[in-house]
């Protein structure tokens, strides 16, 4: 399943909407997403599963590139 993750790069700063970044990640669950991103110390605001029509929309209208976490 593909997830869209809204996050701030620095955990120590107050979240500001204009600084929110997005990445797309393939994982089995929201917990798996958070586990994979844990080592980056991102301030994760929201994790959203992207399926069906929503996925097709994101592919057509956004820069949907899956992040590879090693």
Swiss-Prot record:
Reactions it catalyzes: RNA(n) + a ribonucleoside 5'-triphosphate = RNA(n+1) + diphosphate
UniProt EC number: 2.7.7.6
Keywords for the protein's UniProt record, in alphabetical order: DNA-directed RNA polymerase, Nucleotidyltransferase, Transcription, Transferase
InterPro entries registered for this protein in UniProt: RpoY
A Pfam family this chain is assigned to: RpoY
Role this protein plays: A non-essential component of RNA polymerase (RNAP).
Listed NCBIfam families: PRK13667.1 (NF010188)
HAMAP family (alphabetical): RNApol_bact_RpoY
Protein name: DNA-directed RNA polymerase subunit epsilon
Gene that this sequence comes from: rpoY
């Amino acid at each position: 399943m593909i997830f869209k993750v809204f996050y701030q790069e620095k955990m120590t700063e107050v979240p500001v909407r204009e600084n929110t970044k997005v990445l797309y990640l393939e994982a089995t669950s929201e917990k798996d997403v958070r586990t994979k991103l844990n080592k980056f110390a991102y301030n994760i605001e929201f994790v959203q599963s992207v399926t069906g029509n929503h996925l097709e929309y994101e592919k057509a209208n956004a820069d949907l590139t899956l992040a590879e976490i090693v």
